[in-house]
A protein has these predicted regions:
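Bacterial N-terminal signal peptides
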Residues: 15-26
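Proline/serine/threonine-rich low-complexity linkers at boundaries of modular beta-sandwich domains
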Residues: 33-40
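Conserved aromatic anchor
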Residues: 52-66
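Recognizes extended acidic, P/S/T-rich segments that occur
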Residues: 70-101
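Beta-strand-rich modules
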Residues: 96-117
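Extracellular fibronectin type III
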Residues: 113-133
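Acidic, metal/ion-coordinating pockets
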Residues: 132-421, 474, 479-486, 548, ...
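Catalytic centers of hydrolytic enzymes
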Residues: 139-142, 146, 151-152, 173, ...
């Protein structure tokens, strides 16, 4: 932040005190002193062919906080980007590779928050012009990456299998050295077209998309280990996880196919190491027992997922020792927010500690993010990138190597639909679906439609889900109220709790596309909803159970719910039968401010017991709810999905439209 000093005459002790106070105010930042933002776009961008490439000049945009650290000069897919520190002059020669496609150079400023919009050159160049200044000492590696697909293989709001295939095929024509990667959660929490066939349609889709490697996400463990072994056996790509340990990795195999801590891909003259790391939160986020296995000696063990970057850094060293000249890391951890001049989240914390990677992709938080971080003395910055979930975008990155050294990295978010808020976003121009991919999806869709396109009700509007932060993981939300109220009413308990992460889509579901086009899916409402929508919103097959909870344990449970990586975690409690308020600015473990009954009577942290309905997953310790809901006293009642569907059908039978509930203040965020 820039300050302006006003010259004035100081006299006496009072003036001295005033001067000292002014000096202190300049040295100590206040909470409201700075306005932070992404960088402004460079202007007046011009370019011409030089002796060793394309010379690009620009005028920096107006200063912002956090300060601009540098500029990336690129020309998009297949070009060789170069990085220029902010302290240098605003001119650089962009390398040109042999066979580079034509394009328009552009310049983007970068700071801790991300990239500016591109400043486009007034000049463009054809491939025949670029060949005159191309050099074999310049090489480009292209990376295509997505994450958190969650079985969204149908084309609609998502790219789906067929459009991913056609887009990736077009991108590969721009660079011979192209590698395709996923940062995890390919399966699990998916629409019925994937879940009803044991997720095989998604794995078959990834094979057709020519994915080269993927890290495990927490949702790869939504079913037992035998299922994951089946997934590995069906995969034509390599699974990687450097933070599982050798013993745990030994259980993740099927025949000759096995997960590894890293893999090396030899493509277009590059040897690229791919290293993976899953979130250690997986241990809390999957159903108890899903990580258990029996080793070769017959001993019962549990897959260990280590926190930190020790395993990642070890795998990077091993990959380089094995011949990798560039290493890419896939982390199933997410960016959460830009605040106080810093990009924040477990992904960012880990990336800052990783040594020796050129690109580090994130995932898990379902957000669009990208920036550069320092790469070490004398090295180019490291590229960070993350995408939203459900196949609505992917990243297309270029890594430029000149005389054996990385000199620049660039990233574009390729979007299914335009978004003016994504500075790195470019809308896909490839709109013709791949026929083989479309046929695969149709094969499974035809088997589902008769069962799942059945209308089960009408709703007055769309039940929201997602956003930044996700509404179901950060505060009170209509679907949370609706399902928790149904639980409590059905089993006549004092309270009910639904974890926000169990709500997997809007309702009607964005990622479920009925074959029956007569159904009303858009507009002001009423909107038709189907069994397929219900399966998509609640895909996990959870059972409901009743139990007891003490006042003390209710407080403890709520602290867990607003702790962790709030507002990114699925543990956030949607509730019925009581109210609570919390202050997320306080330390984890002391955020709950007040818990009351509906009439305002305080619920004390004592041994008084209350009856509760919640999910079996939660009772048995999922999402960190360990030993708070008396698992020994739990009684399993019925399926969550049945409760949801039956309520909608009952309204339809009575000629009623199910209303989207208003938020009534049962959950309040204070502070």
């Amino acid at each position: 932040m820039k300050h302006t000093l006003i010259s004035r005459k100081f006299t006496g002790f009072g003036a001295l005190a005033t001067a000292i106070a002014l000096l202190v105010s300049l040295l100590i930042p206040t909470a409201h002193a700075a306005t932070y933002s992404l960088p402004n776009a460079p202007t007046n961008v011009t370019s011409y062919l030089g002796a060793r490439g394309v010379v690009v000049k620009w005028t920096p945009g107006a200063d912002v906080e956090p300060g601009v650290t540098g500029y990336v000069v690129s020309a998009g897919a297949g070009s060789c980007p170069i990085y220029v520190p902010a302290s240098y002059h605003s001119v650089v020669t962009m390398p040109v590779v042999v066979g580079q496609p034509g394009g328009t150079p552009f310049v983007q400023a970068v700071n801790a928050y991300g990239f500016s919009k591109p400043g486009l050159s007034k000049q463009s160049f054809t491939a025949s012009q670029l060949v005159k200044v191309a050099s074999a000492s310049n090489r480009v590696l292209q990376l295509l990456q997505f994450s958190d697909l969650h079985g969204a293989i149908e084309t609609g709001g998502s790219f789906g299998t067929s459009l991913f295939m056609s887009n990736f095929a077009a991108d590969r024509k721009s660079a011979a050295a192209t590698i395709t990667l996923s940062a995890g959660d390919n399966i699990g929490a998916a629409p019925p077209i994937s879940t009803e066939f044991e997720e095989m349609p998604t794995i078959e889709s990834m094979n057709l998309m020519k994915v080269d490697a993927s890290v495990f996400g927490n949702h790869e463990h939504d079913r037992n280990l035998a299922h994951l072994q089946k997934v590995i056996g069906a995969s034509d790509f390599q699974w990687v996880a450097s933070n599982y340990g050798d013993d745990s990795l030994s259980a993740l195999k099927s025949g000759v196919k096995a997960a590894k801590s890293y893999t090396i891909i030899d493509r277009g003259g590059f040897k690229v190491g791919i290293v993976g790391a899953n979130t250690p939160e997986t241990i809390e986020q999957v159903f108890p027992g899903n990580l258990d296995y029996t080793d070769a000696s017959g001993a019962k063990k549990t897959i260990q997922i280590q926190a930190g970057v020790t395993g990642v850094n070890k795998a990077i060293v091993e990959a380089k020792d094995a011949g990798a000249e560039i290493v890419v890391v896939l982390i199933h951890q997410g960016w959460q927010e830009n605040a106080d001049g810093i990009a924040k989240g477990p992904y960012n914390n880990m990336a800052a500690q990783i040594k020796g990677a050129s690109v580090i992709y994130g995932a898990h938080s379902h957000q669009t993010f990208s920036t550069l971080i320092p790469g070490g003395r004398g090295k180019a910055p490291v590229l960070l990138g993350e995408v939203r979930n459900a196949g609505v975008e992917y990243t297309r990155s270029q890594v430029c190597v000149q005389n054996g050294k990385v000199v620049g990295v660039a990233l574009q978010h390729v979007l299914k639909a335009a978004s003016s808020t994504i500075n790195t976003g470019v809308v896909s121009t490839v709109t013709t679906p791949d026929a083989e991919g479309a046929a695969l999806v149709k094969k499974y869709k035809d088997q589902l439609s008769a069962k799942l396109d059945v209308k089960i009700g009408q709703v007055s509007g769309v039940f929201p889900r997602g956003g930044s932060p996700a509404v179901e993981r950060s505060g009170e939300t209509p679907m949370g109220n609706y399902i928790a109220d149904l639980m409590r009413a059905k089993y006549k308990t004092d309270f009910a709790i639904q974890n926000g992460g169990g709500i997997r889509d809007t309702f009607p579901a964005k990622t479920y596309i009925p074959a029956n086009t007569a159904l009303v899916r858009t507009g002001a409402g009423p909107l038709d909803v189907t069994l397929g929508d219900a399966f998509t919103v609640f895909p996990f097959g959870n059972q409901l159970a009743t139990t007891v909870v003490t006042g003390a344990n209710l407080w403890k449970a709520l602290e867990n719910g607003v702790g962790g990586n709030y507002p990114g975690d699925g543990r956030f409690p949607q509730i019925s039968g009581f109210k609570y308020s919390f202050d997320a600015s306080k330390p984890v473990g002391s955020r709950i401010v007040e818990v009351t009954k509906l009439d305002g009577t305080p619920i004390a942290k004592d041994s008084k017991e209350y009856t509760l309905t919640t999910l079996d997953y939660v009772i048995y310790g999922g999402d960190g709810y360990v030993n708070v809901f008396s698992p020994a006293q739990a009684k399993v009642k019925g399926a969550l999905l049945d409760l949801f569907v039956d309520a909608l059908k009952a309204d339809m039978a009575a000629g009623k439209v199910t209303q989207v509930p208003v938020v009534d203040g049962r959950i309040k965020k204070v502070g």
